[in-house]
């Protein structure tokens, strides 16, 4: 590990890459500790709010560090000896340009080149890997371990898929297993929106009603970062509804923080998109693949890779 850290900090600009579970976030924390112990200043960032929370309480999104707002980026200089960017596979060229323009110290980009690029954007990571120094973490072991973790089941009808999905998630609920359902899309019969309402009726049919169609006990995901409340809530964080609080909804985030947000700042999260799951892992994952409805988009290589690698213990791919 010490030689890997040295390699990552040897150059002004470098990339740390590896597959799911290869230790990228752990290495990022080690780099932060090393630089701080030497008296240096670190700016820890990620491309998503959820990924930033995994780096520590003082981490933030890269967009916030650079002062992104309606008029563009307002920060011209970042006062740090080291800037870390986790989930760098989601970088766009313009954001990278603003980052390099503002930074005076070292920049370490951390990510998985096989993950999804931002919607509608050109993948930046693949090109950077050809020109910047690269530290690679345990990729072969990570890929090999996935072979025994992923089960693929094809269904002759949507009804059969939903019947089996009901059995699986009820089994997880009965045994207290942490799980997450994924779909590539929001719309359609097997999209996130419909599956969430369907799963709400299975997992929490009797929860007391709250604003916006939510129920006490529902699993939800934050859709808008809020730093202006007592305990921050960031886009992509998940939690559980505690009940209504005036015109807001009180929830306990998975981090343990309790916040109150408006209904429009939340979505049900029994099922989330593959894009939203990027940067997170769960004990068990059920990856619903609406192949007939979505065609090539649902089976695109990067989409499949991210969906299949979100489970720490096992992933069940359900294809129709």
What do these predicted ranges mean?
Residues 2-7, 11-12, 114-234, 240-242, ...:
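Conserved helicase motor core of P-loop NTPases
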Residues 5, 9-152, 157:
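ASCE P-loop NTPase helicase motor core
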Residues 44, 109, 181-183, 287, ...:
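Structural beta-sheet core signal
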Residues 47, 112, 139, 184-186, ...:
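Cofactor-binding loop segments of dinucleotide-utilizing enzymes, especially the Rossmann-like FAD-
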Residues 86, 112, 185, 217, ...:
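Residue-level signature of catalytic and energy-coupling elements of molecular machines
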Residues 237-320:
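C-terminal accessory regions
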């Amino acid at each position: 590990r010490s030689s890997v850290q040295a390699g990552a900090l040897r150059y002004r600009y470098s990339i740390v890459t590896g597959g799911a579970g290869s230790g990228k976030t752990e290495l990022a924390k080690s780099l932060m500790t090393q630089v701080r112990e030497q008296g240096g200043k670190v700016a820890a960032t990620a491309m998503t709010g959820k990924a930033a929370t995994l780096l520590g309480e003082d981490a933030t999104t890269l967009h916030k560090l650079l002062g992104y707002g309606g008029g563009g980026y307002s920060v011209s200089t970042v006062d740090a000896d080291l800037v870390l960017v986790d989930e760098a596979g989601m970088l766009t060229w313009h954001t990278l340009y603003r980052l390099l323009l503002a930074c005076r110290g070292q920049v370490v980009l951390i990510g998985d080149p096989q993950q999804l690029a931002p919607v509608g954007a050109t993948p930046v990571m693949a090109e950077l890997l050809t020109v910047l120094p690269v530290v690679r973490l345990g990729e072969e072991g990570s890929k090999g371990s996935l072979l025994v973790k992923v089960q693929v089941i094809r269904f002759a009808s949507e009804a059969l898929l939903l019947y089996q999905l009901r059995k699986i998630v009820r089994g997880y609920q009965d045994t207290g297993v942490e799980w997450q359902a994924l779909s590539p899309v929001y719309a359609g019969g097997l999209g996130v929106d419909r599956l969430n309402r369907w799963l709400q009726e299975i997992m929490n049919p009797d929860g007391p009603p709250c604003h916006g169609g939510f129920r006490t006990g529902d699993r939800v995901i934050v859709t808008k970062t809020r730093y202006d409340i007592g305990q921050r809530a960031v886009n992509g964080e998940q939690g559980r509804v505690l009940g209504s609080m005036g015109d807001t909804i009180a929830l306990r985030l998975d981090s343990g923080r309790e916040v109150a947000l408006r209904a429009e700042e939340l979505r049900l999260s029994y099922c989330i998109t593959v894009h939203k799951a990027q940067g997170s892992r769960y004990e068990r994952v059920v990856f619903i693949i609406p192949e007939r409805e979505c065609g090539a988009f649902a089976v695109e290589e990067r989409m499949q890779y991210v969906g299949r690698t979100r489970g720490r213990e096992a992933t069940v791919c359900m294809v129709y």
